[in-house]
């Protein structure tokens, strides 16, 4: 049976928990003919999501942010939208964090969600304006050349990590490739071999050696906005004993003589905790970011001789879009 087929159906007619007519316990289906689907003009229920109700399976459309399970129509809405039995062909599972328009047949209210059986999903892009993004995926040639591993994703302390200065592709080291894009590494003891490559992300430090990174010049970030953030994924390293390296990260914004330092919350993990990425977010409210701003992500423990190792990926400056 395909969408658009004209069919003969034998089964038991009943209603679902939303009191809408349905057919369940189907005994026999016969395809009488094929055909194209002529969908009616959908009713947009986005602006009335909290008040909408219907005793029929009307054809509707709604726009919102998909969070992986439901659609948020607005920050003030009491109800969200659940897409019922969405076929994989719609690709909805890949649209987490996107603004999407879902069109389909109304399937009733099951508080706190309005239910829709989708016939179409339109991707309207990510729910944010991105002013800066670095995911280090462009380091793939160096990752492949060195055979480095994924310590965080595999929770494997023995995953290979090679110094950026020791990996060369087409005559360029990974260290130089990063700095050619405007980044600048900082490190103690004049030892630049303590920044390492993992599979398309960075590892900083070893026992007694510490390091950090200065971002390239970033332009176009609006001033006087309350909802612009700098965010990144990070993780501390676990020692063979199970102890988590006591890393204290900071982000420093410097505009001439003006300096703002933001502390990143500590991981607070117990010994033996499985390695995993943690998202750090820094509000840029009241902080100027332009092409002359120096932004440093680093650790505070520069004078200690202990292990304070950490991983970094997915740096972003962004602003959410209001629906």
Name each model-derived stretch:
Residues 1-127:
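OB-fold nucleic-acid-binding modules
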Residues 15-18, 208, 222-224, 235-246, ...:
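Extended, low-complexity, turn-rich repeat/linker tracts enriched in Gly/Pro/Ser/Thr and Asp/Glu
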Residues 57-59, 233, 274-280:
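Trp-centered recognition loops
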Residues 104, 253, 258-323:
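Terminal, low-complexity interaction segments
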Residues 125-177:
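Extracellular carbohydrate-recognition regions
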Residues 136, 213-216, 222, 226-238, ...:
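Extracellular beta-strand-rich recognition modules
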Residues 199-229, 279-281:
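Short beta-strands within extracellular/lumenal beta-sheet-rich domains
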Residues 244-255:
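Short, surface-exposed beta-strand/strand-loop-strand elements in extracellular ectodomains
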